[in-house]
Amino acid sequence: MSAIDREQVAHLAELARIEMTDEELARVAGELELIVSSVASVSQAAGPDVPATSHPLPLQNVFREDVVGEMLTQEEALLNAPDSQDGKFRVPAILDGE
């Protein structure tokens, strides 16, 4: 498994738009490297005779009836919104026209 270095963490931070200091980048790189090595050691623990599972217990979803409860009107929902337009929340664009 390749080591996680400061440059990879800096790239991920840039993609996530997170500002990090050099000290934070170095610390997070070390922490991520420890996590990756721990996960790698776990993946080696199960041999080829162990079937892959998503959960060790046979759990099933428990569904409930979909019952409509109290709801806000459109006006009530927009009451504390900093900005709205045409009955909808108005937020700053984040994708630069994509």
From Swiss-Prot:
GO terms for biological process: regulation of translational fidelity; translation. Keywords: ATP-binding, Ligase, Nucleotide-binding, Protein biosynthesis. GO terms for molecular function: asparaginyl-tRNA synthase (glutamine-hydrolyzing) activity; ATP binding; glutaminyl-tRNA synthase (glutamine-hydrolyzing) activity. Gene3D superfamilies: Glu-tRNAGln amidotransferase C subunit, N-terminal domain. It catalyses: L-glutamyl-tRNA(Gln) + L-glutamine + ATP + H2O = L-glutaminyl-tRNA(Gln) + L-glutamate + ADP + phosphate + H(+); L-aspartyl-tRNA(Asn) + L-glutamine + ATP + H2O = L-asparaginyl-tRNA(Asn) + L-glutamate + ADP + phosphate + 2 H(+). Its EC number is 6.3.5.-. Coiled coil: none annotated. Allows the formation of correctly charged Asn-tRNA(Asn) or Gln-tRNA(Gln) through the transamidation of misacylated Asp-tRNA(Asn) or Glu-tRNA(Gln) in organisms which lack either or both of asparaginyl-tRNA or glutaminyl-tRNA synthetases. The reaction takes place in the presence of glutamine and ATP through an activated phospho-Asp-tRNA(Asn) or phospho-Glu-tRNA(Gln). Belongs to the GatC family. The lineage of its organism: Bacteria, Bacillati, Actinomycetota, Actinomycetes, Micrococcales. This is Aspartyl/glutamyl-tRNA(Asn/Gln) amidotransferase subunit C. InterPro entries: Asp/Glu-ADT_sf_sub_c (IPR036113), GatC (IPR003837). Heterotrimer of A, B and C subunits. It is an enzyme of class 6 (ligase).
